[in-house]
Design a protein with these regions (language model features):
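Short, mixed-charge low-complexity intrinsically disordered segments
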Residues: 42-71
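A short, exposed loop/beta-hairpin motif centered on an aromatic-Gly-Thr core
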Residues: 18-29
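Short aromatic-glycine-(Arg/Gly/Cys) micro-motifs in beta-strand/loop hairpins
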Residues: 1-20
Length: 71
């Protein structure tokens, strides 16, 4: 499966975050894509990354911010 991976900046008080960078990610499942995306966020050289959003077929299937449980 192909996913659009959006690397997100720090969320504001309302929980909205700007997209810093867009990437494409290939994975067999949403869970595998989420694990890979989390590793990208935690080890990325892109400054200001606080989380990510995974999109498949135009729909958000997962999102995560540093400090959240899961993945």
């Amino acid at each position: 499966m192909l996913f659009d991976l959006q690397l997100l900046g720090k969320p504001d008080a309302a929980g909205n975050a700007d997209v810093i960078e867009n990437r494409t990610l290939a994975a067999a499942s949403v869970e595998e894509a989420a694990r890979a995306a989390r590793e990208i966020v935690l080890n990325t050289p892109v400054p200001g990354v606080y989380g990510f959003r995974l999109i498949s077929n135009g729909l958000e299937v997962f999102h995560w911010f540093i400090g959240q449980e899961g993945v």
